[in-house]
Curated annotation (Swiss-Prot):
Cited function: Possesses non-specific lipolytic acyl hydrolase (LAH) activity. Hydrolyzes phospholipids as well as galactolipids. May play a role in disease resistance.
Gene: PLP3
PNPLA domain location: 54-245
One Pfam family named in its UniProt record: Patatin
Protein keywords: Hydrolase, Lipid degradation, Lipid metabolism, Plant defense
GO molecular function, one term: hydrolase activity
Positions of region (Disordered): 384-413
Species this protein is from: Oryza sativa subsp. indica
Top-level lineage group: Eukaryota
Descriptive protein name: Patatin-like protein 3
InterPro entries per record: Acyl_Trfase/lysoPLipase (IPR016035), PNPLA_dom (IPR002641)
Gene3D superfamilies hit by this protein: Cytosolic phospholipase A2 catalytic domain
Motif (GGXR): 58-61
Length: 413
């Protein structure tokens, strides 16, 4: 009898969060109960049409993207191995990417369009770029005033590429001091109007601008109509997963197959817990700011996991690292003081057991490590890719152009 009661409670819980999801979490229309009923009774969309979403957290420092970069290198290697092509790139398997802070830099690099319409950079290229910026202690070697132009490092990587010049839709958040509200750089908006088309280098500089008393960044659209004064997205959207899902579920033109969260395949990658931050970074960042940023990121993770309900173990993967002890000396390190130590720490986090968000129960350790979850997600990406090749309509019309065999000249960002 108890088992039957538990099943009934589970069904009720799932129905409650389905209503919450449809009404509040991901921004569906605010109709009454009739609309909720129609959403629940709609015929299921084929699993071959799942929209694949990449979401990457990030802070203002290059170190904040190293865990994600290491995970993405592992993920890209896995899909290359399973696809049987060294030319395969992550942008060939994802339909949309969202990145905040250093995660926004990773998303922009992996999805920037190069020769033949192929992705310009590999995950290895992106990791190498972050490591070089770690060695140089930041995105720019020069200190700015109250307002400064985007870091020269981004100009070298992206040149004059804009949001329109990506192989798939890309979302990069920041916080606009002028309007005191979050601002989302979006290819969908850029495609509709030049007033929302920004250069990728400006978007990356904006999302990486320090929010703890550092210099803000001025950015303007390519036609000069829209201007913002930005600080890093950690203020409002350090974890952009919910923003990415909202974008997909409310953008039927690009994602006609996305009827609900069961039609999504999402991987969200964190930055590593701030308990593992280097002492130098902890000294610069107020404790309350770190707590607020981590709390907001965890809240998004918990809310997304709840919204996925019974699909949260199959359709939603969250990769997050905890503080890792140093090999020599006391304390913990996440990002570390050197690029070499940073790589070791990121790899160590991937070997940790994964942490899952559970409805009403907080967190629990999963049976798999972060690395094993990355590998399992790679299998799902390949399965989805295979279904689409079997004459299944694509989940997104974001166009990648060019086959996997199109050669792209190697360049160092």
């Amino acid at each position: 009898m108890e088992a039957g009661q538990d099943d009934a409670a589970d069904r009720l819980t799932y129905e409650i969060f389905s209503i919450l999801e449809s009404k509040f979490l991901f921004g569906y229309g605010g109709g009454g109960g009739g609309e909720t009923k129609s959403l629940q009774c709609a015929p299921p969309v084929s699993r071959g049409n799942r929209v694949c979403v990449l979401s990457v957290d990030g802070g203002a420092r290059p170190e904040d993207g190293l865990l994600a970069a290491a995970a993405l290198v592992r993920l890209e290697a896995a899909v290359q191995r399973r696809a049987g092509s060294k030319a395969a790139r992550l942008a060939d398997f994802f339909d949309v990417a969202a990145g905040s802070g250093a995660g926004g830099v990773l998303a922009a690099m992996l999805f920037a369009r190069g020769p033949c319409g192929r992705p310009m950079y590999s995950a290895d290229d992106a990791l190498g770029f972050l490591l070089r910026r770690v060695r140089r202690r930041g995105w720019s070697s020069r200190a700015g005033g109250l307002l400064r132009r985007p870091a020269g490092a981004f100009h070298k990587v992206f040149g004059e590429l804009t949001l329109r010049d990506t192989v798939r839709p890309v979302l990069v958040p920041c916080y606009d001091l002028a309007t005191r509200a979050p601002f989302l750089f979006s290819r969908a908006d850029a495609a509709q109007s030049p007033a929302y088309d920004f250069r990728l280098r400006d978007a990356c500089a904006a999302t990486c601008a320090p929010s703890g008393g550092g210099a803000a960044v001025e950015a303007s659209s390519v036609d000069g109509v829209t201007r913002i004064t930005a600080v890093g997205s950690g203020v409002a959207l350090g974890n952009p997963t919910a923003a990415a899902i909202t974008h997909v579920l409310n953008n039927r033109r690009e994602f006609p197959a996305a009827a609900g969260v069961d039609n999504l395949l999402v991987i969200s990658i964190g930055t590593g817990e701030a308990a593992g931050s280097s002492s130098r970074h902890r000294a610069r960042t107020p404790v309350i700011a770190r707590i607020a940023a981590e709390g907001a990121s965890d809240m998004v993770d918990q809310a997304v996991a709840m919204a996925f309900g019974q699909h949260r173990t199959s359709n939603y993967v969250r990769i997050q690292g905890m503080g890792v002890a140093r090999r020599r000396g006391g304390g913990v390190a996440c990002g570390g003081e050197t690029a070499e130590k940073a790589v070791w720490v990121a790899e160590a986090m991937l070997q940790q057991r994964n942490v899952e968000a559970v409805m009403f129960q907080g967190r629990r350790l999963a049976g798999e490590t972060n690395a094993e979850k990355v590998e399992r997600f790679a299998r799902e990406l390949i399965k989805e890719h295979g279904r689409r090749k079997q004459h299944v309509p694509p989940a997104a019309s974001g166009g990648g152009g060019g086959g996997l065999d199109c050669h792209v000249s190697k360049k160092q960002p």
